[in-house]
Amino acid sequence: MTMIPDTELVLVVAADENNVIGLDGGVPWHYPEDVRQYKNRIAGHPIILGRRTFESMKPIPDCYTVVLTSDDRRSADSETVEYATTPQIAVEAAARAGASGAFAGDSAGADSSPPVTYVIGGEAVYDLFLPFAGRVFLSRIHEHNEGDRYFPDLGAEWTELSREPHDGFDVIEYEQASPRPLDDL
């Protein structure tokens, strides 16, 4: 078994009151303030996302992007995009980018905590990585929408750390006291 380099997985998601995160390849709401805080949060950090989510978005500047895909014929689109066919390879690639300092965000050298890797969707990727994440930043959209993609319920092991109210949504930070070790991926 390979040892995965040290990194903290943090999920970032926007979900409505029913945990809807998507509809027909997009999101059924538009909050520019939420998009700004999201981009500011992940800027300079490595990110992991699924192929369909990657294809539905514009490239995110200042982020090392690891795309989780089952297509082993994919190759890097640029110096900042890498494809991975397993969760282990995805985390290893993101951790390498974070450890290099080039994509370590504000946590680089700030203290002894490991570099942060953000997991930004979609549904299957959230389901896969949630047990291994130490934190979740959830933009809770105060709407009830139709959807075809959902964020999983956070169980009793998750504790709310903070809540920032905004017009139409709250940004809530949750912490999981004992995430599963990344080597169990």
Curated annotation (Swiss-Prot):
Supply the name of the protein.
Answer: Dihydrofolate reductase 1
Identify the Pfam families for this entry. Answer: DHFR_1 (PF00186)
Q: Which organism is it from?
A: Haloarcula marismortui (strain ATCC 43049 / DSM 3752 / JCM 8966 / VKM B-1809)
Domain of life the protein comes from: Archaea
The family database entries (InterPro entries) matched by this protein are listed as: DHFR, DHFR-like_dom_sf, DHFR_CS, DHFR_dom
Q: Where is the DHFR domain?
A: 8-185
Q: Do you know which CDD domains this protein is assigned to?
A: DHFR
User: NADP: present as a keyword of the record?
Assistant: yes
